[in-house]
Amino acid sequence: APRQVIFETASNLRNVKKGKTVSFSKKAFFNIINLCRDTCSYCTYKAEPTNAKLSLMNKQTVRDLAKMAKKYNCTEALFVTGEKPEQKYSEAREWLKKEGFSSTAEYLIHCSEIVLNEGVFPHTNAGNLTRNEMKELQKTNVSLGVMLENSSARLREKGMPHQDAPSKEPVARLNVLRNAGELKIPMTTGLLVGIGESLEECIQSILDI
């Protein structure tokens, strides 16, 4: 079957080019803020302001977790946030203001300095960062991340999983990856499968990456 041929070809290419060694970086997970302006139909990460799972990590909490990460020999601090929550939630804006910042990206830049000073390398995954935000984070982060998920605009149509997720516009995500390449920032990315995509769309997304 054509699908099996594709899988076998991809596997062979990986083995030839990359080998079979799997490396990893021991990390601590920093759920900085899980409010998010997007609503993806499959998401279990996002919280609403009244949810019990809401996470708002202040500077001291970030510092304390970084110290614990160092104690347990973690190399990396994985910063994860929702997509620009301050654009949708007054609660996010008020919280950021209380911490002394006007945007999530600005706060992440500061938190990156905190964990680096504790001896842990920050890696930030915060959605569609601007080029200038990426340049600032580049000063402290060993790498950045943004999931392409899929480069098909069809998944943004009515009734599809990214209908209410403006940041998942493929052009915007690809632009982040392009900026990372131009700025020489190591980047993690990938596809999300099982959200209504076709095999052809998966293949095209890999080629786009």
Per-region residue spans from a language model:
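An N-cap/entry alpha-helix motif that binds or orients negatively charged groups
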Residues: 1-23
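Short, solvent-exposed polar/charged micro-motifs at secondary-structure junctions
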Residues: 4-5, 32-36, 134-135
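Canonical Radical SAM [4Fe-4S] cluster-binding loop centered on the CxxxCxxC motif
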Residues: 22-61, 84
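Conserved acidic
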Residues: 2, 28, 32, 107
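Conserved Radical SAM active-site core
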Residues: 49-209
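Short secondary-structure capping/turn segments at boundaries of alpha-helices and beta-strands
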Residues: 11-13, 28-31, 133
